[in-house]
Amino acid sequence: MWTRRQRQMCIRDSKKSGPVKKIMSLIKDEDLLIKEGRSIKDEEGHLIVKVKIEEQNYFFKKYRIKNAIHGFSRLFKKTRAYNSWIAFNWLTAVGLHAAEPALIFIENGFLGNRHSFLVTKEIKGQRLDDALSNSANFDTITSGIAGFFKRLRWINFQHGDAKTSNFFISGKNIIALDLDAAGYENFFSRFNGVSRDKKRLLKSIANYPKLHNKLFKRI
């Protein structure tokens, strides 16, 4: 019950956070959220719904605890919504672009964090995989992706799931999405973090040999 569990909410900017009361009402009622929005993905591990509120489109991403084993495995970890929030701040601090969070919400249970929400504003632009299939400018994409990986190396950071569907292109800017697996590289991950991102990105552009060859040399 809502009265029996603590909640944590973080709003990035009160002037830009949008209609918080409406957002919270949808977070509290999953059925209402699905009814008023358009379900993008509904899986055991997460739910994504697009909702239009006061002429602004928002994406609600709910990170679900699948079962008791999954819950126990995440008992001493930060929620994926919180991790996305922290990653956004790391990336923007070094001049990179990422999906802007409007709000994160963390549900706390007796044994720690449970479900969590990340609410982001809709991005103007085109998903990178769609842009590639529509014959986008490879030079712009090459420059943007190479710059993204270069700055990740500056701060020993990793995206965690660097495939084309997790990036948008808006003008000349590359915008990162889905940062719940992103993070600062510690001693154990430093040797394979960015390289794993590189392998994932190159695999996702295997059908575009010209772009693949350019990025292989630059990232």
Task: Show where each model-derived region lies.
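Conserved ATP-binding subdomain of kinase catalytic cores across diverse folds
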Residues: S25-Q126, K150, W154
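Short acidic, glycine/proline-rich loop/turn micro-motifs
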Residues: I69-R74, D130-N134, F187-S189
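Short, conserved glycine- and acidic-residue-centered signature motifs
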Residues: T3, R80-S84, V194
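Active-site acidic catalytic loop and adjacent metal/ATP-binding pocket
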Residues: I48-V51, F59, F149-E185
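Single conserved hydrophobic/aromatic residue that forms the stacking wall/gate
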Residues: M1-I11, D129
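C-lobe/activation-segment region of protein kinase-like
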Residues: I174-I219
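Conserved kinase catalytic-core helix
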Residues: A81-Y82, A87-A98, D129-S165, I174
